[in-house]
Amino acid sequence: MNLDQYLPVLLFILVGVGVGILPMVLGRLLGPVRPDSEKNSPYECGFEAFEDARMKFDVRYYLVAILFILFDLEIAFLFPWAVSLKEIGALGFWSVMVFLGILVVGFVYEWKKGALDWE
């Protein structure tokens, strides 16, 4: 086995790691170091930092996040299906239609239950 073939890959990895680490090292070595309480305090979009990091969130945020992930995964399943639609034939087409039907029924159920209402 000839290891000379892997030299470009090794060089590519070394250059990539160097590009990632070199700016951090240069910033640490060349940057000014004058810490004070103002610089060390957390900054949150122009507002004063909250006292407690454990803020209570409304459950609807989590519900929207879960629904987003669910329908995002649906798109992830539909893309390979659309690419290979010619090869999979009628059985593949109808199996995806059943999959979409189940998702549509779930979406209508969520809509009727008020999961998408923000009031």
From Swiss-Prot:
**How does the protein's chain sit in the membrane according to the entry?**
Multi-pass membrane protein
Q: What reactions does this protein catalyze?
A: a quinone + NADH + 5 H(+)(in) = a quinol + NAD(+) + 4 H(+)(out)
UniProt record similarity statement: Belongs to the complex I subunit 3 family.
Record-linked InterPro entries? NAD(P)H_OxRDtase_bac/plastid, NADH_UbQ/plastoQ_OxRdtase_su3, NDAH_ubi_oxred_su3_sf
What role is this protein assigned? NDH-1 shuttles electrons from NADH, via FMN and iron-sulfur (Fe-S) centers, to quinones in the respiratory chain. The immediate electron acceptor for the enzyme in this species is believed to be ubiquinone. Couples the redox reaction to proton translocation (for every two electrons transferred, four hydrogen ions are translocated across the cytoplasmic membrane), and thus conserves the redox energy in a proton gradient.
Q: Which HAMAP family does its entry note?
A: NDH1_NuoA
Q: Where in the cell is it found?
A: Cell inner membrane
Name one molecular function that GO assigns to this entry.
quinone binding
This protein's assembly is summarised as: NDH-1 is composed of 14 different subunits. Subunits NuoA, H, J, K, L, M, N constitute the membrane sector of the complex.
Q: Which Pfam families match?
A: Oxidored_q4
Q: Which UniProt keywords apply?
A: Cell inner membrane, Cell membrane, Membrane, NAD, Quinone, Translocase, Transmembrane, Transmembrane helix, Transport, Ubiquinone
| Transmembrane feature ranges | 7-27, 63-83, 88-108
EC number(s) for this protein? 7.1.1.-
Q: Would you tell me the protein name for this molecule?
A: NADH-quinone oxidoreductase subunit A
